[in-house]
Amino acid sequence: MRDKLVAMLELGRKAFESADSAVELQEIRVRFLGKKGELTAIMKGMGQLTPEQRPVVGALANQVKSELEELFEERSRIVGQQEMDKRLKQERVDVTLPGRRNSCGTKHPVTLVIEEITDIFSALGFSVAEGPEIEQDFYNFEALNMPKDHPARDMQDTFYINEDVVLRTHTSPVQIRTMLKHAPPVRVIAPGTVYRRDSDITHTPMFHQVEGFLVDRNITFGDLKGILTSFLSQIFGKGLNVRFRPSFFPFTEPSAEVDIQCVMCKGKGCRVCKNSGWLEILGSGMIDPEVFKSVDYDSETYSGFAFGMGVERIAMLKYGVNDLRLFFENDVRFLRQF
């Protein structure tokens, strides 16, 4: 049995030293040291030895096992390093090669429309202002002629952070913040994200809006009509029929909804315009004196108008998109079309 152990050790040493891959090393380890390996087979014959021989053979068996395990570990380190060196050599990177440019994406259609709206109003003399999306109740409601318990608040389903803080339901709070900081004349648009508790094919809980307002001496409804008619003809094309309908907003008086001739059917009537030939596009009106009172503007000296529009709605009509939710699903097949 001693001779078998010595012979197995020599055979194992040669096998480990000649192995040149991790897979081969593992196969050799199992062959000699596994549960059904050669060492286990030899040790099964221990019962045939005399009591005096067993300790000697057992010690030799343990020595052989230890040496084979050390050979396996040492050769594994060597082979592992060789394989790593080979891999690094094969996967070498030539740092002198010219770099590859990242492929550029495209702007989101909502971003394109916001930029176009901004460009049009900038050419008309408007500057751009921004405000916080988490807004105080005062700026979102009270200063816009909607005090606590005012029935007009029911027109908008609001996300409340707490009793006095909300996710803004429109970008009109920017109008209040701007007028509190600047004396007339002011001519500003405020694009931004707004939030309302509504979700269907034409509404989402988060969408984009552009608020605009102008305050100066002797501003009339005719000025409002001229500005909006010019804007709509530039965004949708010349020759567009526009109409103003009387409406109600708590922060403007008089107020008007602005409709355009349906861009889908050219006024003939279709499913999109509900066979009316017209599409509601934005709300507008002359700024209410109560709003001027909130910002310490003299309504006897100054007058002004305000308007607001949903960017996604304009994008839907401009690009012929029939489902508002497509703008928020991040489908590359859809976005690549713009």
Curated annotation (Swiss-Prot):
UniProt enzyme class: ligase
Ligase is among the record's keywords: yes
Single Gene Ontology BP annotation: phenylalanyl-tRNA aminoacylation
Tree of life domain: Bacteria
Cofactor notes: Binds 2 magnesium ions per tetramer.
Chief localisation class: cytoplasm
EC number per UniProt: 6.1.1.20
Keyword Protein biosynthesis appears in the UniProt entry: yes
GO cellular component, one term: cytoplasm
Cited InterPro entries: aa-tRNA-synth_II, aa-tRNA-synth_II/BPL/LPL, Phe-tRNA-synth_IIc_asu, Phe-tRNA_ligase_II_N, Phe_tRNA_ligase_alpha1_bac, Phenylalanyl-tRNA_Synthase, tRNA-bd_arm
Protein name from the UniProt record: Phenylalanine--tRNA ligase alpha subunit
Organism: Syntrophotalea carbinolica (strain DSM 2380 / NBRC 103641 / GraBd1) (Pelobacter carbinolicus)
Gene encoding the protein: pheS
